[in-house]
Amino acid sequence: MKYSFIIPVYNRPDEARELLESLNRQTLRDFEVLVVEDGSQLPCRDVAETYAAKMPVRYFTKPNSGPGQTRNFGVERAEGDYVLILDSDAVLPEGYLAAVDAELQACPCDAFGGPDRAHASFTPMQKAINYAMTSFF
């Protein structure tokens, strides 16, 4: 397995559904998905189980501890060579993983990152803050 997507979730089953649907549309399929429920009152188990029939999805629950520990929980259980951590409100374009894979083959590295795409409704200030907080390292 080359890629492991870690998705920490807290009370966001609808967002998790949209993200899992975007992962299910990826053209490159060498990945697993770990959904880590962080003490949610609105669990997304049913959503995860629906997508587990379409792609490798593992679902975990744990007591609420915040995003950092929840990400680490997923990373500790990941089987991929690369770990990609996504917030539950992310939606990936269809060719995202294929583009990442092509770039990593052309220029191998141990870690990578980059900016999010700002939502169309963001003000210029929100776009600037979003870019500053998610820029390449």
Language-model-detected regions and their locations in the chain:
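Short loop->beta transition adjacent to catalytic acidic/histidine clusters or analogous donor-positioning motifs
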Residues: 1-4, 24-35, 54-58
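Donor nucleotide-sugar binding loop of glycosyltransferases
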Residues: 12-15, 40, 67
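A conserved acidic beta->alpha catalytic loop
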Residues: 22, 29, 37-46, 64-65, ...
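Glycine-rich, basic loop-to-helix element that forms the pyrophosphate-binding segment
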Residues: 44, 62-78, 99
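Conserved donor NDP-sugar-binding/catalytic core segment of glycosyltransferases
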Residues: 95-127, 131
